[in-house]
């Protein structure tokens, strides 16, 4: 019986140690996409689109996406 109790205690201690090392998860806000209001022409440079969305429009990020009939700069904002 004493051996069983020590095994249970050891398992509980291991569970506590593993739980202590688990990284907390962060919940990210959902992002909504919107065509850039400041971009003109066809979007061919993802980095330039991203920088323009962040700096000029206050978006989280941006990228060139195909929206019929051409690639457009799309900015991503919190919903």
Curated annotation (Swiss-Prot):
Q: What range does the record give for the signal peptide?
A: 1-29
A Pfam family this protein belongs to?
A: Gamma-thionin
Instruction: Write the protein's name.
Output: Defensin-like protein 3
InterPro entries under this entry?
Defensin_plant, Scorpion_toxin-like, Scorpion_toxin-like_sf
- What keywords does the record list, in alphabetical order? Antimicrobial, Disulfide bond, Fungicide, Plant defense, Secreted, Signal
- Disulfide-bond pairs as recorded: 32-79, 43-64, 49-73, 53-75
Indicate where this protein is primarily found.
secreted
């Amino acid at each position: 019986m004493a051996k069983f109790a020590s095994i249970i205690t050891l398992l509980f201690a291991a569970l506590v140690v593993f739980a202590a090392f688990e990284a907390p998860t962060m919940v990210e806000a959902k992002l909504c996409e919107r065509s850039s209001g400041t971009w003109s022409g066809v979007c061919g440079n993802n980095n330039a689109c991203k920088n323009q969305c962040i700096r000029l429009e206050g978006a989280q990020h941006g990228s060139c996406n195909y929206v019929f009939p051409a690639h457009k700069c799309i900015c991503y904002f919190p919903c």
